[in-house]
Structure formats: C-alpha cells, structure tokens
C-alpha cells in the first residue's frame, strides 16, 4: 500500500470515516505553495508511521464539497479523524518534528 492515498468525495466516507485507526487527511491544492512544502513531510509521516496512522490527501480543487463539509478555509489544512470524527486540526506548514509532536497522541 502507498504511504499516502488519494481520496475523493466518493471514497472519503469508506476510507476515512470508517477506518479502524486514526487517519491524517491533508486538504491541499496543486497551486498552493505551502501545500507543496508540506507534501514531503506528509509522505514521510506516512512512510514512518503507516502502521499506526493512515495518511490521505484530498485535492480541494477537485473535491470542493468535501472542503465545504469540513470548513476548509485555508490550505494546507490537516485533519486527524478518529472513530469517524475530527480529533485534531492543523493549519499551515510545519516541519516534520512539530507535526509528529502534534500527532503523537494518535501514534501510540
């Protein structure tokens, strides 16, 4: 399985909300500079912690209904879903160490 999966409006509920472990979802867009900066960090988290957390990406340009559903007003926005509910929200770029620190409760 890839370190990071892409989801869309038709696969989101099954892949994210019904997942049996925490899921980190990166809401991004191709034109977004900070999104491009955080992308390698997201990939690394997926590779390093893939056994404990699922990592997914949602292109907000292609999935505007999902962006509206989760009130995504700026990108990148990262949401951790646990048991089908939003458990944490991170907005903007952050280095890997800071991201892993914020995700620590979900990686145990």
Task: Write out the residue ranges for each language-model feature.
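Non-catalytic, surface beta->alpha helical segment in thiol-disulfide oxidoreductase systems
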Residues: 74, 79-108
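Conserved redox-active cysteine motifs that mediate thiol-disulfide chemistry
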Residues: 27-41
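Structural microenvironment flanking redox-active thiols in thiol-disulfide oxidoreductases
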Residues: 58-67
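Short pre-active-site segment immediately N-terminal to redox-active cysteine/selenocysteine motifs
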Residues: 20-21, 28-31, 74
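Conserved hydrophobic/aromatic "anchor" residues
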Residues: 12, 27-28, 70, 81
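A short beta-strand-turn-helix
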Residues: 5-23, 64
């Amino acid at each position: 399985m890839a370190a990071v999966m892409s989801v869309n409006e038709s696969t989101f509920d099954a892949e994210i909300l019904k997942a049996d472990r925490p899921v980190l979802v990166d809401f991004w867009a191709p034109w977004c500079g900070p999104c491009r900066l955080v992308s390698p960090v997201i990939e690394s988290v997926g590779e390093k912690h893939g056994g404990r957390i699922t990592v997914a990406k949602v292109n907000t340009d292609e999935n505007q209904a999902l962006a509206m559903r989760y009130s995504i007003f700026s990108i990148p926005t990262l949401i951790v879903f646990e048991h089908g509910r939003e458990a944490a929200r991170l907005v903007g770029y952050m280095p890997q160490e800071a991201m892993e620190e914020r995700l620590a409760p979900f990686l145990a």
